């Protein structure tokens, strides 16, 4: 059937997104200039921020790059901000872009080692409580040094691999679609498959929360951490020590929640690996190990050594994070024999869409700076007592991060806090404490929904989610106990532990104030 040009344009616009979503974006693009020119630039700026948060919240309807990018282009075109201001924001945060481009790609070439580690964990530990704890701890440790997206991508790869193996055995057809259960005729096999799905769901959620628990602790754990660390003038060790008064209690309580959920089988947790599935997977692993030749074993050893280099380089701050990632790419590809251009290109596919989206974030941040959108909120917070400021920053960050992207929220708030310091409104010591409150507030409560954590969103939109019946609602439900405990313990840490423990560490010589002075631009 022939369609009109108008229908064709509407169908092409934002692809398979729902019509109501397309019309909402078109309405935003029509209303924004009218409000900017005829009502108030300040109101138009806030409308842009709310609309951009809306595109992030609707990430499952349409990837936010396209609608958010259209809104950002229009904002620059009508004069909400200038191309120069956008370029300046991008230049200020070049380190973060390099982290996403090179570090994620670098870890892609270490996937063999990470797959090997998680496979051995899954098959060698029989106790579900111990296994869940191991996955959570392993994800937390890896996310402290690697990118959380990459860690969750590896766990997804392992889970999809195992699911595929068992599905083929259960259906007696290795060539059938793993999304099709109609070939599994035995009721017992179907029951086993459902239990296996529940088992994988719980492991994936533990691993996802583990990336948040570890990611908050170091400056490379999450992209926004690097922005906050740069603004405060902290290196790897400084950042880790500064966060410890809040992150250590949260880590301990998070792991305790993991144990309790599995022990009492709450919130959809507690399913064990069916013995039949374990046998199938163990047999497969034995065959794979027997086929592994010396060349492949050497590759695993090389990747382990590169992992050691990565940890040392980050801990001693031997180079900028992105450059360390580039060194990982060069070392891993050189010594593992990956020299084909197309094989190299695959490593960059995961990170580049998010890198482009982050660049759009910076355009919206430029609007916020140009129009002074957050100034009233910051002034309200800064009028309260210094101790109340910390809790308010933590809560405001947490609330926004649970519905929006935490990179965006963290960037906005640290810029505003830095501006207050440069104007002499707050002291250097208070600015540093606020930086801790912003970082923890941005990272911890954001596990509430997939919108807040990039790793959770990646899991929800992955090929694994429909296989194990992991929906948006189920993710929110399974994350709820973690959200309550991590947010609550984080708030108590900011309120009661942060100031005294930080002062004690300064007196003990464990940390010192960085050499940044009021009036110096954030770019330096």
Curated annotation (Swiss-Prot):
<feature type="transmembrane region" description="Helical">
    <location>
        <begin position="23"/>
        <end position="43"/>
    </location>
</feature>
<protein>
    <recommendedName>
        <fullName>Na(+)/H(+) antiporter NhaB</fullName>
    </recommendedName>
</protein>
<feature type="transmembrane region" description="Helical">
    <location>
        <begin position="136"/>
        <end position="156"/>
    </location>
</feature>
<dbReference type="GO" id="GO:0015385">
    <property type="term" value="F:sodium:proton antiporter activity"/>
</dbReference>
<keyword id="KW-0997">Cell inner membrane</keyword>
<keyword id="KW-0915">Sodium</keyword>
<keyword id="KW-1133">Transmembrane helix</keyword>
<dbReference type="Pfam" id="PF06450">
    <property type="entry name" value="NhaB"/>
</dbReference>
<feature type="transmembrane region" description="Helical">
    <location>
        <begin position="45"/>
        <end position="65"/>
    </location>
</feature>
<keyword id="KW-0813">Transport</keyword>
<keyword id="KW-0812">Transmembrane</keyword>
<keyword id="KW-1003">Cell membrane</keyword>
<keyword id="KW-0472">Membrane</keyword>
<feature type="transmembrane region" description="Helical">
    <location>
        <begin position="358"/>
        <end position="378"/>
    </location>
</feature>
<feature type="transmembrane region" description="Helical">
    <location>
        <begin position="325"/>
        <end position="345"/>
    </location>
</feature>
<dbReference type="InterPro" id="IPR004671">
    <property type="entry name" value="Na+/H+_antiporter_NhaB"/>
</dbReference>
<feature type="transmembrane region" description="Helical">
    <location>
        <begin position="304"/>
        <end position="324"/>
    </location>
</feature>
<keyword id="KW-0406">Ion transport</keyword>
<feature type="transmembrane region" description="Helical">
    <location>
        <begin position="420"/>
        <end position="440"/>
    </location>
</feature>
<feature type="transmembrane region" description="Helical">
    <location>
        <begin position="98"/>
        <end position="118"/>
    </location>
</feature>
<dbReference type="GO" id="GO:0005886">
    <property type="term" value="C:plasma membrane"/>
</dbReference>
<comment type="function">
    <text>Na(+)/H(+) antiporter that extrudes sodium in exchange for external protons.</text>
</comment>
<feature type="transmembrane region" description="Helical">
    <location>
        <begin position="392"/>
        <end position="412"/>
    </location>
</feature>
<feature type="transmembrane region" description="Helical">
    <location>
        <begin position="479"/>
        <end position="499"/>
    </location>
</feature>
<feature type="transmembrane region" description="Helical">
    <location>
        <begin position="448"/>
        <end position="468"/>
    </location>
</feature>
<keyword id="KW-0050">Antiport</keyword>
<feature type="transmembrane region" description="Helical">
    <location>
        <begin position="239"/>
        <end position="259"/>
    </location>
</feature>
<comment type="similarity">
    <text>Belongs to the NhaB Na(+)/H(+) (TC 2.A.34) antiporter family.</text>
</comment>
<feature type="transmembrane region" description="Helical">
    <location>
        <begin position="203"/>
        <end position="223"/>
    </location>
</feature>
<keyword id="KW-0739">Sodium transport</keyword>
């Amino acid at each position: 059937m022939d369609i009109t040009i108008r229908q064709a344009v509407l169908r092409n616009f934002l692809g398979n997104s729902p019509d109501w979503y397309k019309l909402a974006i078109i309405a935003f693009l029509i209303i924004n200039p009218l409000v900017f020119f005829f009502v108030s630039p300040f109101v138009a700026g806030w409308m842009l921020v709310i609309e951009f948060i809306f595109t992030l919240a609707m990430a499952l309807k349409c990837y936010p790059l396209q609608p958010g990018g259209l809104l950002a282009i229009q904002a620059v075109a009508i004069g909400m901000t200038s191309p120069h201001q956008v370029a300046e924001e991008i230049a200020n945060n070049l380190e973060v872009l390099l982290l996403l481009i090179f570090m994620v790609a670098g870890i892609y070439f270490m996937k063999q080692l990470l797959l090997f580690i998680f496979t051995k964990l899954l098959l060698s530990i029989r106790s579900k409580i111990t296994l869940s704890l191991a996955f959570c701890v392993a994800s937390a440790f890896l996310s402290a040094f690697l990118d959380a997206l990459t860690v969750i991508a590896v766990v997804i790869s392992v889970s999809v691999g195992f699911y595929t193996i068992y599905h083929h055995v259960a259906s007696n057809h290795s060539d059938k679609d793993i999304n099709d259960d109609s070939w599994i005729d035995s009721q017992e096999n179907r029951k086993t498959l459902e239990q296996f799905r529940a088992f994988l769901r719980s492991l994936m959620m533990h691993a996802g929360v583990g990336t948040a628990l570890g990611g908050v602790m170091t400056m490379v754990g999450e992209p926004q951490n690097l922005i906050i660390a740069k603004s405060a003038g902290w290196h790897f060790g400084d950042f880790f020590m500064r966060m410890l008064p809040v992150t250590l209690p949260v880590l301990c309580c998070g792991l305790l929640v993991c144990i309790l959920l599995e022990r009492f089988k709450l919130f959809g947790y507690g399913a064990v690996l069916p013995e039949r599935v374990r046998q199938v997977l163990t047999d497969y692993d034995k065959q794979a190990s027997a086929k592994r030749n010396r060349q492949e074993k050497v590759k695993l050893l090389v990747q382990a050594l590169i992992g050691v280099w990565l940890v040392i380089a980050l801990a001693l701050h031997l180079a900028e994070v992105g450059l360390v990632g580039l060194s990982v790419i060069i070392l891993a590809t050189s010594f593992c024999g990956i020299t084909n251009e197309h094989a190299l290109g695959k490593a960059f596919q995961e990170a580049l869409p998010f890198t482009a989206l982050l660049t759009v974030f910076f355009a919206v941040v430029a609007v916020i700076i140009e129009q002074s959108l957050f100034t009233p909120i910051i002034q309200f917070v800064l009028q309260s007592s210094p101790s109340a400021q910390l809790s308010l920053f933590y809560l405001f960050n947490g609330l926004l991060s649970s519905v929006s992207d935490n990179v965006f929220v963290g960037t906005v708030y640290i810029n505003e806090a830095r501006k207050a310091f440069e104007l002499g409104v707050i002291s250097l010591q208070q600015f540093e404490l606020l930086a801790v409150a912003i970082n923890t507030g941005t990272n911890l409560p954001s596990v509430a929904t997939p919108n807040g954590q990039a790793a959770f969103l990646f899991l929800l939109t992955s090929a694994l989610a429909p296989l194990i019946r992991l929906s948006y609602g189920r993710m929110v439900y399974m994350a709820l106990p973690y959200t309550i405990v991590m947010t609550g313990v984080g708030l108590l840490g900011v309120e009661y532990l942060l100031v005294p423990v930080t002062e004690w560490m300064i007196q003990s010589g464990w940390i010192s104030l960085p050499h940044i002075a009021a009036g110096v631009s954030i770019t330096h």
